[in-house]
């Protein structure tokens, strides 16, 4: 296979990477015929990096940094982005935090200026802390009022117990209420340093021009002698057994999530696991959707989910149904999981699931924002860019035999589960569910 030269158009379009002093990485992907540009500062710190006493600090800080900098108020920041019709936002996850902007390519210098100012110079002023504390508490209350969102946090806590990935990203009303300005400032100073950061951009972007902008705005933070932090490995160990959690609530429906612990994203059978998840409950033709909804009409919403972290993961099933149908939903769900664990999926199901993964991957990367996100996550998680073509090849190499071996290995494990609905005690829950949790 010939090497790509700089004159080769394919080589010119390949993602580029520069490591600056201090360990800050800049990765870009130029997309021809795209007028927009997306840029994000990815920080390799998330909710799993907090101590239990400051649960929610990463998310609280993400809110707080937008309130003011030494040269801009929150209104100044908002008006500057509104004036160019762009988007400026952020999100916090278990293992990272991202501050990003989506603008016209010609407005990229402004976007870099704003994002860098927020990330590096957010003031954490005392008055701002109290105002934003109330905002976060309202967000927690809103999440608790949404059964599906509340159940997602309950399930991970039931599955992982005291392990950091089992704690809600948003924290709790109790932890956020007592968090101090000093704790938030300490978190910012310790973890928001260049070696923990990746600046990723995609779209109408010039790599060398972006590197120059980053040098300008990160300035004195780029101290020589530091190297990028290696991709996260995690502890590799989750103590304790999964459990069953019930929250009794007067509601029209019963909501349930149940699932198993899996290896993390670096597992050699990671894509076979993704195929298994897709065949189980990842689409309209999946086993669970067909058996629970289409054939029996027991629930409107039923699906599977796969969450992968550095050292662990969760394969789960979610369903919502009328309380009187809960036992039937659990009976059918248990039958499907037992059948797949025992007999596996078919060659046809494997092919459909692989096609769904391939199509979803490519269709989900047709804009600059999604490309930027892929660049940032790949750099933080793996320390390098993983091309779309590489991922597509990995999916294509999955065989039905590998998927079924993964199913036998994982689906016989002890399950964790969370239930939210009008049920008075765990003893009143379906026997099939209690048996799976053990």
Curated annotation (Swiss-Prot):
Keywords: Hydrolase, Metal-binding, Metalloprotease, Protease, Zinc. It comes from the Bacteria. Zn(2+) binds at residues 59, 63, 139. Belongs to the peptidase M16 family. Its cofactor is Zn(2+). The keyword Oxidoreductase does not apply. One of its GO terms (biological process) is proteolysis. Its EC number is 3.4.24.-. This is Uncharacterized zinc protease MT2852. It comes from Mycobacterium tuberculosis (strain CDC 1551 / Oshkosh).
